[in-house]
Amino acid sequence: KELAQICAMHPNVYVAQTTCAHFNHMYRAMMEAMEFPGPSVVIVYSTCQPEHGVADNMAMHQAKLAVDSRAFPMMIHDPRKGNTIKERLDLKGNPSVKDDWYTIRKTDETINFITFARSEGRFAKHFDEDDNPSPELLASQHERLRNWNMLQELAGII
């Protein structure tokens, strides 16, 4: 469920979706949420290392990858910024905010939801012996892209 987007559709609610790997974004979100003169919701990504099959020392890396892959886009919805969603919704902090997927310039590697899924043991059953993703995983990637494109549209980026 897209809890942040659901909350943002309620009138006069400050909403942030952030991660511990993006400290400045998280700090800003927490400070603004506490200062907001109404209800605030701050959703912070946290991997469950044993259940997700992620090493104990990789929590920050995984949180960054969740954002980079569009699995968990960062956003801030601040009703004080204006009367329209475009004015209130801020996607700053996400990489390549105008693009569908983030591409690492040095390696030309595209980071997408499949990249994220490959990094977590819980998705291992969705890859065949040749490392090809299952139809379900490809559908999840398509859904993540649709969600990202909707956020871009709401924020007036596309």
Model region roles, listed by residue range:
Residues 1-36:
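Conserved thiamine diphosphate
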